[in-house]
A protein has these predicted regions:
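Short, charged/polar N-terminal "headpieces" of proteins
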Residues: 1-22
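A generic short-segment signal for beta-strand/edge and adjacent turn/coil regions
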Residues: 2-6, 48, 59
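Glutamate identity and glutamate-enriched acidic tracts
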Residues: 3, 30-32, 38, 60, ...
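Generic preference for hydrophobic/aromatic residues in regular secondary structure cores
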Residues: 4, 41-44, 78-81
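Aromatic-enriched hydrophobic runs in primary sequence
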Residues: 5, 14-15, 35, 58, ...
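A short, structured beta-strand/loop element
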Residues: 15-49
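C-terminal structural segments of small proteins and small subunits
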Residues: 53-82
Length: 82
């Protein structure tokens, strides 16, 4: 499970052979959630709303890059929010 980004205590991962729809995993303390790349909504899991908003904003900025990683399975680090 490659870590692709980390910011404000949020850790973002993507699995190689995960199920559709395209999503990424977010960890924050004891919270974990799968976030849809398309719209930044929670697929399943739970996050504090402030961290969900940050993860969704980050995903919107990097949507095309995230979708490319999902489709090619070529993972790399992505610039965090600052």
């Amino acid at each position: 499970m490659p870590e692709i980004c980390r910011f404000y205590g949020i850790v973002i991962y993507m699995f190689f052979n995960d199920h559709n729809p395209p999503h990424f995993k977010v960890g924050y303390g004891e919270f974990e959630a799968n976030i849809l790349i398309e719209n930044g909504n929670i697929l399943n899991g739970d996050l504090p709303i402030s961290k969900l908003k940050l993860a969704a904003a980050w995903a919107e900025i990097h949507k095309e890059e995230l979708l490319k990683m999902w489709n090619t399975k070529e993972f790399h680090k992505i610039t965090p929010l600052s």
